[in-house]
């Protein structure tokens, strides 16, 4: 065992039960290597592990030096929103479909993880967005997002009329099916599908991408990540929502605004030493290949 990481958390809820074999293999291997291991409570229950230290995501964030998320990007997003509040590094083993945020190949995960545990890794900070639904005389409803915050109708698709203010200055109005507000991390997710630009992870920028705008002139907008975005609504309907990473939905009531800003904390995401963002674009998303 080395001094880079002493306590390691195992998290992630796989879509297919067969993926639990990766959790169990990882747990046994880490114990054999002499690490202190904390297993997320639900995973320990599903694996029927006895006399094993377990904890919630928050407890793992408080106690562990490294969290290994086993699953796909959805698992990573769900875990990362909580773990980002704590001083913990996060890495993923891909047991999902795309695995854009989960770097480690399940067939070679232990060797790759061994290198990481020996200190051979790349570390980067990914910022989150904080979304607030608020009105002066009402309590705020707050959530966070690693990828994106999306304004959309709640049940039936229809046009939404809204205004966008950036740092309390009017920027534009729009009639569309919604709006995607994305981090650089999320620029290769839903935002990309809607025609948004790809932002490299180190950029301090936020993109605003219209969803099916009823105009010929709407274009994605890139702004500084220090800006605050306010969404205002004229003719309110009762079914508008904002969703965070397509996992958490906050309803918008009449008279309420939506505020979106950069979070005060960030995700400590680590990768194998040979990680390349542009290689990931190529292998995961079919980015253009080299010609020579």
Swiss-Prot record:
The keyword Kinase applies. It comes from the Bacteria. Keywords: ATP-binding, Cytoplasm, Kinase, NAD, NADP, Nucleotide-binding, Transferase. The record marks 175 as: Responsible for conferring strict specificity to NAD. PANTHER family: NAD KINASE (PTHR20275:SF0). Pfam families: NAD_kinase (PF01513), NAD_kinase_C (PF20143). Equilibrium mixture of dimer and tetramer. It is converted entirely to tetramer in the presence of the inhibitor NADPH. Signal peptide: none annotated. SUPFAM superfamilies: NAD kinase/diacylglycerol kinase-like (SSF111331). Transmembrane segments: none annotated. One of its GO terms (biological process) is NADP biosynthetic process. Its cofactor is a divalent metal cation. GO terms for cellular component: cytoplasm. This is NAD kinase. NCBIfam families: PRK01231.1, PRK03378.1. The active site is at 73 (proton acceptor). Its EC number is 2.7.1.23. It is found in: Cytoplasm. Belongs to the NAD kinase family. InterPro entries: ATP-NAD_kinase_N (IPR017438), ATP-NAD_kinase_PpnK-typ_C (IPR017437), NAD/diacylglycerol_kinase_sf (IPR016064), NADK (IPR002504). It catalyses: NAD(+) + ATP = ADP + NADP(+) + H(+). The keyword Aminoacyl-tRNA synthetase does not apply. NAD(+) binds at residues 73-74, 147-148, 158, 175, 177, 185, 188-193, 247. Allosterically inhibited by NADPH and NADH. NADPH is the primary inhibitor during aerobic growth and NADH during anaerobic growth.
